[in-house]
Amino acid sequence: MPRAPPSGPTTAPGREDDARGLRKRSRRPGLGEAGGCGPEAEGLEESRQKRRMVARASGREEVESDKSAKEKRKVTEASSDDPQPGIDLVRKESLTSSESFPTVECSEFQSMAFLQSLGKERLVEGIKRRIRIKKCKSLESPALKMTENKATQNSKVEFQDELYKNTLKYSCNSLSPGVENNSVLKLHDCSCLSHSKDCNDENNLAYKPDGGCMHVPENSSKSKKENPRSLIDKTDPSNIPQLLQTEENVMRVSQLLLEENDSYLSKNNGLFSCLQSEKTKHSIEESSIGRKSRKRMKVSEKGNGMVIEMKFSNMCNKSELMLQGNQTGADGKETEILEAKKSSLKVLRKVNNNTLSPMDPLLSLPETGKKTSPEHCANAVFQKALEQLSKEETKNVSQPLGCTSMDPPEDYFKSMKNSLVKSLSDCFPIEKRSSRESLKNEAEESKYSCQRTIPMTGKRTWPCYSCARISAQCWKKASLPQSSRQDDFLKHQMNQTHLTDSKLMLQSSVTETNSASSSIEKLDSNLNCLPSVSTVEPTSVVIKEPIVNDDEKMKSEELSRSASEVVSNTTEDTSLTNMTHNLTGSKKKDRGNLTKLNLTVASQDGQEANNSTSKTVHRKACITKQALVVPDLVKILNTGRLTNFKIPLLKNKTEKRKEINAKSSEREVYSPLELLDSVSGAEVRQSRTKENAVTVTSGPQSLSIQRSVIPVQASSDSFCSKNSCIIAPSFLKQGNNKQPSNHISASGRIISNNAAGSLTVENNTFSCDPGCIEKNPTFYSNEQEPFKAVSSEVSGRKMTENFSEIKVGFPDILKAYEDDVLLIDVIQDDPDLFGVSNEGELSFPSEVPMISQEPNVAEEHQSTDSKHMELPDKKEPSNALRELPVPDPGSMKSEICASLSAASEIKHDSKDANISLGEVTHETSSNEKPRGLSEQTKSSDLDEKCRFSDKVAIREEKETISEVCRRDSKNTEIMVGECHLAALVSKPLCLPVPLPPLNLNAHQEDTLLNPQMNDFRLPGKHSVLKLQNPEICEIFKREKNVGVFQKPLGLMIPHRYCKFHFNTLRGCERSQCKFGHVPEQGDEKVCMDVFKKYISINELCLLQRAANMFMEYYRKFLPGIHFDLQVLNDLLSSLLKHCLLKEVFQVMNLCIMIKMLPALKILLKIFEYVATMKLRNAVPALINIFCKLLEAGMVLDPEHFNYIVKLLYQVQASKQEITAVLEMKSRLHMRQFKKNWKCDLEAALNEIEHCKEKGDWTKLGNVYLNIKMSCEKFADFQRFCACIAETLTKDCKEERPGVPFCEFAETVSKDLQNSEVDKTLLGRIGISAMYFYHKLLQWSKGRKVLDKLYELKIHFTSLKGLIGPEKLAPRCQIVNIAAEIFLKSGSLDGAIWVLRESEWIINTPVWPCDRLDVLNRHNLLCTIAHEILAKSLYRQTFEVLQNLPGFQNSQETVEVSQYSLLFNKLLDACIESNSLGMSSSVAEFMISKSIPIDFSFLRRLITSLGRSCLWLKARAHYKSALSLGCYPPLEGNLYRKLLLIPSYLSEIEMLLAIEIFLVSNASSIQSPGTSTQMLQIVLKRSEENKSRSKDDYQAAVERLITAARISDPKLFIKHMTVNVNKEQVYSLEQCSALKWLKENMKWAGKVWLFNNH
């Protein structure tokens, strides 16, 4: 693997020299004074210069890093799938080009793999060797004083500033020079990933030995394997020289730092080596102060880390954009690789990613300087440890991270520190001890550190010994062996991690290897952006390594992703968030990765701190104040991320609280680092609970995680709580060792350089708002100076002012630290802590910048760690703490207030995180639950406001908060909180009330564990936390952080009900709540009280909850005595005001079901609202509800109906809908009448008379309908109808044009429920009216009545009247009257219709009638027949004549012969009109009925029929006429062969006579013997014809001849002679006759020979 270091840019050596000079200068002032202000100033200047150089380099590197980041993402995704054993950062050094750094960002493993593919392992190994050599040298140096460290940090900070500037040029996002170690790395990062990313082979030459050498062995190989492509793509030869230069500078700086760290490592084994080295010296100087000094150092360190993170976030935003893009692809593979590599690879990967960005170079340089020698040792050990850990992690995924991975990987962690890939424990021990010592220390620290950060098995249950449950126990380092305690603590963290779920799994990183890798990549990108971030990376790497050890392989990768995501978010809280947005493509994965990585780093740092109280994180070896500042940022980051963790803190909560309380009290004796570790562990738990990714595993682990997370979480309250707890332990420890920067670098990469350059980084970080970071890498450079000042302040108390300048000042926290005050952030309204109180809202001074709170948080955590029981004492700085709570908006979402000090710190840190993490929070919140990040951002934002007067920081914080709020708003859980958060942002963030003592309710302690306690329930996303009691506490905390949300509503709720659901604005956010959310039967009064309260508050969420509660309760139970209709009306009105129309409809429908109708005004308001808003789609549902309400008994006046119809027209309702309303109007009138006139016939009769007087027949119809519905007895109703009939038939004046019956019938007929009974009654009333008008001879009115009956299809002919004679009238009479009315009114059709309707019935057994009625019918029919015949309506006339009396049945004794005239007249008319068919029918009917028929008409008919060729009918009628005597009989002439034909016959008649003659003589004609005989025809003259002229007879002759011709076949006749009577005699030719017979004999014989009658 070792490779020759690539020839770096020409500037690299110079930079190294500068770094070395910076180291020297930093050592001097650091030794001279704790603050190191003087040297810091110089360091700041130099660092600024170097930053400029780095910025220039970064500008170029950014472009490359972007490309490489994209490639890395791909490689990372591929690599993350398959976890590989640890790969050396040396392998990552194969990233000779700047693109390799982006690849590292994407994933350590990918970058490692890429490095391998590049074949640049030799360069990496060479770098490692250099770093190791430097580490050895630094280790050889006995110990550096805190002042030396601070000075070195200051110098590094200055150098980093310059590097940062240069880095900005090289990379899109360059971290501010706040991180001293990162500054050195940043030089490399300009060309490649700085030391902060071990994956950067070229850039991290110095750094890789520091942070990633040990870790690289396992991870580098894998990352190289996985990321060869991405690394190659991303590695940019242009960056190589810069990386070399940076590496050289880093090596120089790292040598100085390592020397200092070596002294500390020798003093402090494990994570505390750096911090405790500072602490030891500082504590030696302030031995009387003891823990307070440690706390101060941690606070300063946290502040520096915060600042670094802030600047990192700014720088990282750009670089991270590139890195995240790469990280996104690399996340998937990184996760698996990290799992196998125990998150050390994650760190490396992130380091590589960071190398791509300017942040990484800056970070890598300082870290390399500090941790080179220890990490060389650690690398060897770490490689082995990684292998072992990878195996152990695979086996012990469920085991506490610290237990398995912490012990062996201490050295490994040391190397991991330099590379974020290292596990948490590895990070801590890496500081300056040998690999073995570090591993041991880490094992011990892991026992005491919060196990949450440790790899998560994915289980929700945490062992009772987990940090979440026994953070106090974790703190007891003295009581337990450090290794064992660390193991236990890691176990707890592991448990917590399991509780934390996927995000805690980030710490465990086994399950979430991908996310961890992404996190690391993001972290790396953050590191690239922020110099301090690189420092954080090593720490986070160390933290992640333990995570990888257990379940962490999978989860460590996840943690890496989350941690790096957190780091990016944290560092970029202001800047990183922007970076994250820039890295939109890989933003989500990167965010998750960063968060997880940060979490892992934080937890690792916490573990490291626990393992070796004396140990200080290598990268945290920076100034104590810087480390403290960074811890705040880390807290903020962690807080935001912790929200993602879901830890059931309720389990064994009471016992654990007690233990934590007792331990916290006992831990006053313990080092502040332990306390911080414990607190961080608790906070990490909460963070996990809320932010799986954010919360690392344990207090110590979360500490390191916080480093990486700090930049991200700095913008959220959750960061304060989480980081406060996480950072507190490691920073207290680191504060002594002045290595909190490492821790911060792990979490945010700002912290990593906290020791030497964390302040600078923090300044940059703080100066970089989320927007700034994202938007402006130069902003980092601008803020690098403030960071430098901050770093100097951290070393010399100027941090606060510088942070103010940076907009992230930490005045209160620094003061508190200086004053040895423990700042505690507590929610005054937290019922778990203080019971339900009305102090939920906290005033937040907008003056304090967000970042300033982070340093305070760091100080608070340090003080908390140093003095577990001093948390109450440090309530004096509670303003800062409250400022931290001020991020309550963030806290609400992230539940940052899990621990008191953590809560306060979280709030302050949240503000800080808001500045640096604002944008990071967006990333984190998008990857995690937006609520947590937003909470982090808000809390950090609020804290900054409280802490710093810098308004710019506040603005940035607000921007961050607004961004976070927007993200959160996307999440329903955070929606309400976001609004309040925005409000809080606008408000000043100041918590005037001192925080109550940490000793609170067990539940409260679990949630808000004292900063001493490691319980991280404060982490950002309380909504994510599904904790039982802790979750409730977190909810209250969040609500309090948000102000109104956390404030109880003041309801007195029975204990069996969930007070959060009923008594808070946010409601219960637990997935499964054991308390009731719906009142039980008998608690209707509770319902009403809740409704009243919610209505009075008039909040949208509460009104929705009230509506749902109403629906759920009254679906089960009926309204009782406590039901208040006014409350229902108020609820509906409030819902309508908030445009909750759906809920309004639901409640209305349920009200109808339970028969509790709302007020009419509510219904009208709903119609008005729908009409005003033009909600056409809502009209059908509204009409449905309207109809149901009316049917249920609601009464509306006619004007109300008219108004509703008007509104419906406005909304363009359909005709059907409007008709439905009108129908309901009529039905309502009926109901009203029914209600007023129930069976009250007397009143009804009076009403009838009243209607009669007024002539209001429509109203009479309504009266009828109402009576019909109300009457129970039909007889009574008939009486009433008789009264109506009388009214309609009496006293009617002719002058009135209208017919009362018609109006009345029209009204009644409109009733939809009209039945046959109604029709019958109307028909009977109509008959009475008809009789009435018939008597009055008012034919027109009578006809109107008949027309109405016809229109209504009422068959009145079968009915009888209701009153008078018509009541007994026969049917014939009724029909006669009706027909007569029609006839008199001129309607023959009407008359015929009536007759037909009655079936012409006159007198039948069923319908008997009088003779007078029959006579009347005869006369009526005759009259009708004459009128119809006059109109030539022969068929109708014949129909009428056929139905004359006497024709229907035999009972009628009428003589039909009297109808002869009528029929003959009809027959004549038909013949005249040539209606042969009708004529034939009439003739047949007359013949059949024996009606005398006129022969002339009959003969005419026969002739007409024949001429019309209707021979059949002609022959039939001729035969009938012959039988009737119309023709003379043939007598006997037939057989004499003589035919006598009268001359008056027509030719048709003559032919018919000839046919009969032929048929009669057929036998003789056809016989052969008779051929001699002749057939003679005599045209006989009649006597009448005698007197006539000859012409008539001659015409008869012609007719005869014609008759013979028309025959078929023709007949031939010959004139023979004239007889005596002068009659012509003709002979019929035999042949023609024979022929005719042959053809016609068949039918002719039938017709003529047989009688058909």
Swiss-Prot record:
Region described as Disordered: spans on this chain: 1-88, 212-238, 553-591, 855-893, 919-942
Keywords: Cytoplasm, Differentiation, Spermatogenesis
Localization in the cell: Cytoplasm, Cytosol
Biased composition (Basic and acidic residues): 58-69, 221-236, 858-877, 920-942
A GO BP entry: apoptotic process
InterPro entries: TOPAZ1, TOPAZ1_dom
Principal location listed in the UniProt entry: cytoplasm
Biased composition (Polar residues): 561-585
Pfam families: Asp_Glu_race_2
GO cellular component: cytosol
Primary role: Important for normal spermatogenesis and male fertility. Specifically required for progression to the post-meiotic stages of spermatocyte development. Seems to be necessary for normal expression levels of a number of testis-expressed gene transcripts, although its role in this process is unclear.
Name of the molecule in the record: Protein TOPAZ1
Species the sequence originates in: Bos taurus (Bovine)
